[in-house]
């Protein structure tokens, strides 16, 4: 059980595939399992590993609260797919990635390439490019429910919502909203949005929303679901 070496491309690929149908490492809310895996990463995953990057940006938004997240933080080898060897206690093994679609792009290994070998290589390269161009591009999206809290009961909540909806980004679509009482006459704005994971992260949203500091005290992610 484990992800392998999360500082290697192979380990990050395992993490991406593990999170393809999950929002969190365990369960349906952020927990110490997410903290353990997050802390094992040396940096954000690259953009092409969009499931891993989406999860990384979401957990990063809990950085200030990570010590209070539920659960018990365990060793990294206790998380991840069961068919992956835990290499966290030793040097990660180098893995040889399989060629895409089992196509050999390079043909002969001889120093002097024959005309036939060159022709075969060119044909296989053209075949590979043709298959690659036919693969549909999947756009990963997530539905996010945000809780936006004002400073006090005198904050103009209509203006606050207007400020939020003025945030326009490629990959961001605002949805329905409502005011929810929180006590002492104060109401928070609960608003839905849909984002493209590789374009919009919760950390970017939080930065833009809290920039309206005259109206917004804080922003929290109330729910996060992959579409």
From Swiss-Prot:
UniProt-listed InterPro entries: eEF-1beta-like_sf (IPR036219), EF-1_beta_acid_region_euk (IPR018940), EF1B_bsu/dsu (IPR049720), EF1B_bsu/dsu_GNE (IPR014038), Glutathione-S-Trfase_C_sf (IPR036282), Transl_elong_EF1B/ribsomal_bS6 (IPR014717), Transl_elong_EF1B_B/D_CS (IPR001326)
Cellular component annotations (GO), alphabetically ordered? cytosol; eukaryotic translation elongation factor 1 complex
Q: Enumerate composition-biased segments (Acidic residues).
A: 97-115
Q: What is an example of a Pfam family matching this protein?
A: EF-1_beta_acid
Question: Single Gene Ontology BP term?
Answer: translational elongation
Q: Which molecular-function annotation in GO is an example for this chain?
A: translation elongation factor activity
Report the residue ranges that make up the GST C-terminal domain in this protein: 2-90
Q: Which UniProt keywords apply?
A: Elongation factor, Phosphoprotein, Protein biosynthesis
Where are the Phosphoserine modifications? 108
What SMART domains does this protein map onto? EF-1_beta_acid, EF1_GNE
User: What post-translational modification does the entry describe?
Assistant: Phosphorylation affects the GDP/GTP exchange rate.
* Region called Disordered, residue ranges: 83-120
- Extract the PANTHER family matched here: EF-HAND AND COILED-COIL DOMAIN-CONTAINING FAMILY MEMBER, ELONGATION FACTOR 1-BETA
| Family, similarity comment | Belongs to the EF-1-beta/EF-1-delta family.
| Function of the molecule | Catalytic subunit of the guanine nucleotide exchange factor (GEF) (eEF1B subcomplex) of the eukaryotic elongation factor 1 complex (eEF1). Stimulates the exchange of GDP for GTP on elongation factor 1A (eEF1A), probably by displacing GDP from the nucleotide binding pocket in eEF1A.
Q: How does it assemble?
A: EF-1 is composed of 4 subunits: alpha, beta (alpha subunit of the eEF1B subcomplex), delta (beta subunit of the eEF1B subcomplex), and gamma (gamma subunit of the eEF1B subcomplex). Interacts with elongation factor EEF1A1.
Tell me the protein's name. Elongation factor 1-beta
Q: Provide the species name.
A: Xenopus laevis
């Amino acid at each position: 059980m484990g992800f392998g070496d999360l500082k290697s491309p192979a380990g990050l690929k395992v993490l991406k595939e593990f999170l393809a149908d999950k929002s969190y490492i365990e369960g349906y809310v952020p927990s110490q399992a997410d903290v353990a895996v997050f802390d094992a990463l040396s940096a954000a995953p690259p953009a092409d590993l969009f499931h891993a990057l989406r999860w990384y940006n979401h957990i990063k938004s809990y950085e200030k609260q990570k010590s209070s997240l539920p659960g018990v933080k365990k060793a990294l080898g206790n998380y991840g797919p069961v068919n992956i060897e835990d290499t966290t206690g030793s040097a990660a093994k180098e893995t040889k990635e399989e060629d895409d679609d089992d196509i050999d792009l390079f043909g002969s290994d001889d120093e002097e390439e024959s005309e036939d070998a060159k022709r075969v290589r060119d044909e296989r390269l053209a075949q590979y490019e043709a298959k690659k161009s036919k693969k549909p591009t999947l756009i990963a999206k997530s539905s996010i429910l945000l809780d936006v809290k004002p400073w006090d009961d005198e904050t103009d909540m209509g203006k606050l919502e207007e400020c939020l909806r003025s945030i326009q980004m490629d990959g961001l679509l605002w949805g329905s909203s409502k005011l929810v009482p929180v006590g002492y006459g104060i109401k928070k704005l609960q608003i839905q949005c849909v984002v493209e994971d590789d374009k919009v992260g919760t950390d970017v949203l939080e930065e833009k929303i809290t920039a309206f500091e005259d109206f917004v005290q804080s922003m929290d992610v109330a729910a996060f679901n992959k579409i």
